[in-house]
Amino acid sequence: MPAASAIHTLIVDDQASMRALIRTSMQALGFREFREAGDGEAGLREMITRPAHLIISDFNMPNLDGLGLLRAVRAHPPTAGAAFIMLTGRADRELVQRAVQFGVNNYLVKPFTVAQLKDKVEGVFGPLT
């Protein structure tokens, strides 16, 4: 059982309000280490500079979307093992299937509750302490 406070998280979303909501939700679950990026390109730079244990990324973003970020993270050996949860505003089966093909660990449809986020994170890491 990992301690939530030990999991370094990268939040990638082009909306600052959504990044704040994710951060606040994660803090409620005991997470303490965060970095943020406003698009996939910035998220990839963050991951290359200092890899995170968990990436929570929006799908629909400018410059490099969430699927492009996922593919780039999985292709780069130092970051390939990071857990990746994709956020999407639409429950699109084709999108989910494509993300699974590229190695997404879980996905979450917006809007979401803290309990739903917890379920998705625990689906990747197991029960949190």
Predicted regions located by residue number:
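Receiver (REC) domain active-site loop signature in two-component systems and cognate sites
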Residues: 61
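Short amphipathic alpha-helix used as the core "switch/output" element in two-component signaling
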Residues: 45, 67-80
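Two-component/phosphorelay signaling modules centered on CheY-like receiver
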Residues: 16-35, 102
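Active-site beta3 strand of CheY-like receiver
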Residues: 50-56
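Helix N-cap/capping motif at the beta->alpha junctions
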Residues: 36-45, 66
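C-terminal output helix
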Residues: 94, 112-121
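Alpha4 helix (beta4-alpha4-beta5 surface) of REC/receiver domains from two-component response regulators
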Residues: 23, 68, 91-106
